[in-house]
């Protein structure tokens, strides 16, 4: 089952459960230039320019999360790629999958800008830019 949590709820869970692993599934460019949560493991679900699913995604996650009962929190830009990545992990036997609603940047606002309506960064949670 895939659970949905707000960024704040996800942060709270990570503070309470040291087995929890946050996986940032965005591209290398997003991760480096837009910023990323401190402590997140970066494993892209899809990568530009062809936007094909990373065939090594599940294998790469297994390197960081051996316990399939540990909470695995997934984050993308706005919450869609992370759901797809969570489904792949669910098929691989992971039991505690958490999609972070609104991702890192949140939904588009009325001016088609991200970062003003929600997401990890908007919530004031720890993040850095490379």
PLM region spans:
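Short, surface-exposed ligand- or partner-binding patches at beta-edge/loop junctions that are enriched
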Residues: 75
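Rhodanese-like catalytic fold shared by cysteine-dependent sulfurtransferases
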Residues: 1-21, 28-71, 82-130
């Amino acid at each position: 089952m895939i659970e949905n949590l707000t960024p704040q709820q996800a942060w709270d869970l990570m503070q309470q459960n040291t087995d929890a692993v946050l996986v940032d599934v965005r591209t290398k460019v997003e991760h480096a230039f837009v910023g990323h949560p401190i402590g997140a493991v970066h494993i892209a679900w899809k990568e530009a320019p062809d936007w094909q699913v990373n065939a090594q995604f599940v294998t790469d996650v297994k390197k960081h999360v051996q316990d399939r009962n540990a909470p695995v929190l997934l984050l993308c830009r706005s919450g869609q790629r992370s759901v797809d990545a969570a489904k792949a992990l669910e098929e691989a036997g992971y039991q505690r999958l958490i999609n972070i609603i609104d991702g890192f940047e949140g939904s588009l606002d009325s001016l088609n800008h991200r970062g003003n309506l929600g997401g990890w960064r908007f919530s004031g949670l720890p993040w850095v830019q490379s």
